[in-house]
Amino acid sequence: MKILIGEFAVGTDIEKSLIPEGAAMLKTLAESFVRVGHEVCYPSAGTEIGSGTALKSTADSFVQVIEREAKNCDAGLLIAPDGMLPELNRILAENTANLGCSPEAAARCADKLRCTEILKTAGINAPEIVREAEEGKKYVIKPRFGCGAEATYLVSGFENTGEFIASEYIEGEHLSVSLIAGNKPLPLTVNRQFIEFNEQKDGINPENIEVSGIKYNGSLTPYETPRRGELYETAVSAVKYLGCFGYVGVDIVLSEVPYVVDVNPRPTASIFGISRVMREEIGELLLTNRFGTLPDSVRVEGEYHFSKDMLGELFGKN
């Protein structure tokens, strides 16, 4: 089969700081598909990953390249900012077999307010959305539409605006569950996320010195915990009610109960580590999810830790 993989940072070169993480995910997927006998192509604005065939693209032509090349491929998978993913997945699905989420599911996940409401209606624990700050409490502020820890802050006060949402801050372990969603959901691993809090005196709330930027800096895969079953059950329920399909990363803060803080309807950076400890090929699993029946479980051996700095060293130079 011929597989199209589109990763936004690599394909557009718009935000160079995101290229290492994007290239790591792209290379991981491309190498996996190639190892099991498939042909891979990917849009690139200059970054080479050493696997598959690069298709010349730019910030202006990325969408057109996806639409054009999808017609010549048997299947495709896209990684893009949450706000762009629904439309890109629509274009992909109209031209080939989409191995990822439907446009509708991607849109539900992209809207952090709507996503939280869906989860809570389904009885899944998620941090409460807060309209007004109370003295002595901490809150997480993030864009209503955004990716991961992008423009996310821990604050002691905030102004309520339509662009950002505020939620209660939950103390606990910062984890994620990586899984393949579909008719037969397949949990892959629990991952420990390395989250850094950097105090800032400006930014989203310049008059409040108690502002900390929240930064994701890699993960450990797998993370062994006696509550793995509870975490898997929570993640599977979340993707079920959101209607996700394909590779999904569910961010969870594990406190007295698991709290779902974000659902990423696309491959996430954790895939870089998972591919190094999982015996099965992620590419084959994604195709089987679309065209066949997934196994009951996967085999994981050893552990792997990476940081964003490490990805920068590996993929920071074209």
Regions found by a protein language model. Give the residues of each.
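Nucleotide-activated donor-dependent transferases that construct or modify glycoconjugates
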Residues: 1-18
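Short catalytic helix/loop segments, enriched in acidic residues and glycine
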Residues: 17-33
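Conserved N-proximal alpha/beta basic substrate-recognition cap immediately N-terminal to
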Residues: 42-128
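Peripheral (often C-terminal) accessory segments that flank ATP-dependent C-N-forming ligase machineries
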Residues: 75, 285-318
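ATP-grasp fold ATP-binding core
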Residues: 119, 136-152, 163-172, 177, ...
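ATP-dependent carboxylate/phosphate-activation module, predominantly the ATP-grasp catalytic core
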Residues: 167-243, 254, 264-291
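Flexible, glycine/charged-enriched surface loops at secondary-structure junctions
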Residues: 245-251, 295-299
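Conserved protein kinase catalytic/activation segment
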Residues: 257-259
